[in-house]
Amino acid sequence: MTKREILQRLKGQLIVSCQAYEDNPLYGTENMVTMAKCVLAGGAKGIRACWPENVRAIRALTDAPLIGINKVMPSADTDFYDSVFITPNYESAVAVIEAGCDVVALDGTLRGRNEKELTELVQRLKAAYPDIVLMADLATVEEGIICEKAGFDILSSTLSGYTRDT
């Protein structure tokens, strides 16, 4: 699919997040595939999945637009509200792109980095993967303005409530 086709298929549609942490009974790739089957059967037109192994398995199931994230959770001594953890760097983005996502969602907040670093990450990904759709997970209007200028294709308020500013 082209970027335009992906964006058109997602516009105004239900996107369901299929993810679970290790301490959740639904944790595991097999369960995420089952969850994806259920949400698609229920009418979802897109899926958001975490970690390369889940993205790869769900991609094998469907050609529905797939948003990939690669959470890198902060260490116990790092404050959650100060951490960039949703696809925080180039390597984590490449892992879910190579696993088969159509859209890669990145942390679009400025926690732990500045606007220039975020813009450079976007430019590097666009140069290496010109057909991938880039989604900014952000928390504030100000971050939305910065992310739009940086070149993200989709802006989402996913992190509202998960940062010190919100």
Predicted ranges, named:
Residues 91, 96-108, 112:
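Ordered, amphipathic secondary-structure segments that act as subunit-interaction surfaces
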Residues 38-41, 68-76:
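Metabolite-binding pocket within alpha/beta catalytic cores that recognizes anionic/polar moieties
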Residues 1-26:
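N-terminal amphipathic alpha-helix/helix-capping segment at the start of soluble metabolic enzymes
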Residues 130-131, 154-166:
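Catalytic-face loop-and-helix region of soluble metabolic enzyme cores
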Residues 3-8, 37-40, 55-63, 97, ...:
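Surface-exposed amphipathic alpha-helices with a cationic face
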Residues 14-18, 47, 66-70, 104-106, ...:
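Hydrophobic faces of well-ordered beta-strands that scaffold small-molecule active sites
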